[in-house]
UniProtKB/Swiss-Prot annotation:
Recorded coiled-coil stretches: none
GO cellular component, one term: cytosol
Entries under Pfam families matching the protein: TACO1_YebC_N, Transcrip_reg
Protein name: Probable transcriptional regulatory protein IL1088
Organism: Idiomarina loihiensis (strain ATCC BAA-735 / DSM 15497 / L2-TR)
Length: 249
């Protein structure tokens, strides 16, 4: 299909910035702990935990660290009392923004989030104001070197919902959250190494941003992702690879 993977360019930028800030392990451990607390400590019966562990392993987290986080979540070890919160809002040019947070202090978190929105041209919305624009999906991405033919049969047989192939050579395999682990296992078994694999919030529609709007929006995105309590930031902005490259220079 025409264009490029709609979440690849900003995802790669975000991953690099998370690593630079040294925050990626903190967020991964928090997600593993809460996933185990909510759905149990067995990744075979807890798809969310399975996805969190896979992501941690892909970021070279040690298995001992993962096991400790699972035990804290499942109650085998003492852990922090962390709440999950979702906030919704709009960025510049009407971009919808959905935040997943984990916090031990709700008042601090909402104050920090509201400040970031108001400072950088956005506004914090009410519950339900943008969540309906997103659907939770598993996304397994492949870059150059993996063909649509290679992923088609094993992905669909394992329960994938869709396969999107883009002009520049990348491929996204779309799954339900429940089938994410099974589909990834099937593709891994074929020796197909994903460039990125996660359960995420996929927007129904996108808002195209020009360079100036993108510059403003990315400042807001950086500010939100830099907040300690913010776990994930989802949005429906579409920014071209060329604009991303110019703004990163």
């Amino acid at each position: 299909m025409a264009g490029h993977s709609k979440w690849s360019n900003i995802k790669h930028r975000k991953a690099a910035q998370d690593a630079k800030r040294g925050k990626i392990f903190t967020k991964l451990i928090r997600e593993i702990t809460v996933s185990a607390r909510e759905g149990g400590g067995d990744p075979e019966t807890n798809p969310r935990l399975r996805a969190a562990i896979d992501k941690a392993l892909s970021n070279n987290m040690k298995r001992d660290t993962i096991d400790t986080a699972v035990k804290r979540g499942s109650g085998d070890l003492e852990g922090d009392n962390v709440d999950e919160l979702t906030y919704e809002g709009y960025g510049p040019s009407g971009v919808a923004v959905l935040l997943e947070c984990m916090t031990d202090n709700r008042n601090r978190t909402v104050s920090d989030v509201r400040h970031a929105f108001s400072k950088l041209g956005g506004n914090l919305g009410t519950d339900g104001s943008v969540a309906y624009l997103f659907n939770k999906k598993g996304v397994i991405s492949y870059s150059d070197g993996v063909t649509e033919e290679q992923v088609m049969e094993p992905a669909l047989e394992a329960g994938a919902e869709d396969i999107l192939a883009y002009d520049e050579g990348s491929i996204d395999v779309i799954t339900s959250p429940e089938n994410f682990g099974a589909v990834k296992d099937a593709l891994d078994a074929k020796g197909l190494e994903a460039s990125n694999a996660e359960v995420t919030q996929v927007p129904d529609t996108r808002v195209d941003l020009d360079e100036e709007s993108a510059r403003t929006f990315l400042k807001l995105l950086d500010a939100l992702e830099d907040l300690d309590d913010v776990q994930n930031v989802y949005h429906n902005a579409d920014i071209s690879d060329e604009i991303i490259a110019r703004l990163d220079d």
